[in-house]
């Protein structure tokens, strides 16, 4: 093999060959971006997650579907359109989905997200037009158009995803993976048991968890450790531009809200799911079977993770049941149990700053 100096002499001696080599290197295909459908209820942290997705070359956002949750379906659609317009991405279809959860009344969260859902920041009117397709139908169409290539990244209640599965179960084996923000195996943030996205439509969440596809749950165990601090805010404020300034404003609102409650920073809930879609090595996962509690008086919306992998086998004998052993329970989810918070936060800041 030629030394480096020898290679340089060879290239100088044969400039035509050097040109061919350069052309070949430039023509080499780049690593394919991961195709994602971003399902969202924007929402402040949804806004942060969307901007992270749009600023990550590893991701190819094929569609944005809007679900009610943090805000109403109508407000969420308007927010999504204004954000893609701000980012100059009118090429991405934005579609309205469900108007309400499957069975219960909607619970919105202006207290945490501002009156308009975007930290009370008034973005310019959108230059983008809404896609006329129903969100779950758009999800189904895109999955069939790119079988085994689409990753679903829902960061709100799972109503749209559940409706798509119920309408066309054949999409399940055609989805590459589902990376969702929601749930917790260590306690909730709405109450002692439930996380907000799951709580806002437990029946939909149970459908999604039991569908049978590759699923990663990015829950409170990640977001509660990845806290966006005043230091991160200062770093973000070093550069300016329409997207950067908007994200700075949202984070300033959230950090201020966190400080009111004595926290050192604002949890990066929804951006964490996007970050995991970009780089799965950010988190540590544990495979387990997850069910969603849909009936409990105090636990409705809880994601119940079976970390042991088995359940007691009870057999009826006369007037009582007798435990006769254990039955294995197959895992249906990879549950994120830990995160490299510093690396996740630096990814977020650097991507928004365009570095």
Regions found by a protein language model. Give the residues of each.
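Bacterial N-terminal signal peptides that target proteins for export
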Residues: 1-18
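Boundary at the C-terminal end of the N-terminal hydrophobic targeting segment
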Residues: 27-33
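Metal-dependent C-N hydrolase catalytic cores
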Residues: 33-36, 77-145, 328-339, 344, ...
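Conformational coupling and interaction surfaces
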Residues: 33-34, 51-55, 60-61, 199, ...
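Active-site histidine-anchored catalytic micro-motif
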Residues: 33-40, 44-82, 116, 122-225, ...
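Structural signal for hydrophobic packing residues in well-ordered secondary-structure cores
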Residues: 84-88, 143, 147, 212, ...
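A residue-level signal for conserved active-site and pocket-lining positions in enzyme catalytic cores
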Residues: 94, 208, 274
């Amino acid at each position: 093999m030629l030394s480096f100096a020898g290679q340089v002499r060879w290239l100088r001696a044969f400039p035509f060959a050097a040109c061919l080599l350069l052309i070949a290197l430039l023509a080499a295909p780049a690593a394919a971006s991961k195709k994602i459908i971003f399902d969202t209820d924007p929402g402040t942290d949804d806004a942060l997650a969307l901007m992270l997705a749009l600023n990550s070359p590893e991701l190819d956002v094929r569609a944005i579907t809007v679900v009610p949750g943090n805000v109403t379906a109508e407000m969420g659609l308007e927010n999504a359109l204004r954000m893609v317009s701000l980012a100059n991405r009118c090429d991405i279809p934005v579609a309205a989905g469900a108007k309400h959860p499957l069975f219960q009344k909607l619970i919105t969260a202006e207290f945490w997200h501002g009156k308009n859902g975007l930290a009370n920041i008034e973005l310019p009117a959108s230059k983008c037009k809404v896609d006329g397709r129903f969100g779950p139908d758009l999800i189904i169409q895109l999955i069939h158009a790119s079988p085994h290539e689409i990753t679903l990244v829902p960061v709100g209640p799972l109503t749209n995803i559940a409706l798509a599965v119920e309408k066309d179960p054949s999409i399940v084996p055609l989805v590459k993976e589902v990376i969702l923000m929601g749930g917790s195996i260590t306690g909730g943030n709405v109450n002692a048991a439930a996380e907000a996205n799951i709580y806002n439509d437990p029946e939909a969440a149970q459908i999604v968890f039991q569908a049978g596809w590759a699923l990663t749950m990015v829950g409170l165990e990640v977001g509660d450790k990845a806290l966006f601090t005043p230091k991160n805010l200062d770093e973000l404020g070093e550069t300016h531009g329409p997207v950067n300034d908007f994200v700075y404003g949202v984070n300033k609102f959230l950090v201020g809200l966190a400080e009111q409650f004595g926290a050192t920073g604002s949890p990066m809930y929804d951006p964490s799911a996007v970050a995991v879609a970009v780089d799965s090595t950010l988190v540590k996962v544990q495979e387990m079977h997850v069910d969603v509690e849909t009936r409990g008086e105090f636990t409705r919306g809880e994601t119940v993770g079976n970390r042991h992998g088995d359940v007691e086998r009870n057999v009826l004998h006369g007037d009582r049941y007798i435990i006769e052993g254990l039955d294995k329970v197959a895992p249906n989810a990879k549950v994120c149990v830990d995160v490299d918070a510093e690396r996740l936060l630096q990814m977020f800041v650097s991507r928004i700053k365009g570095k």
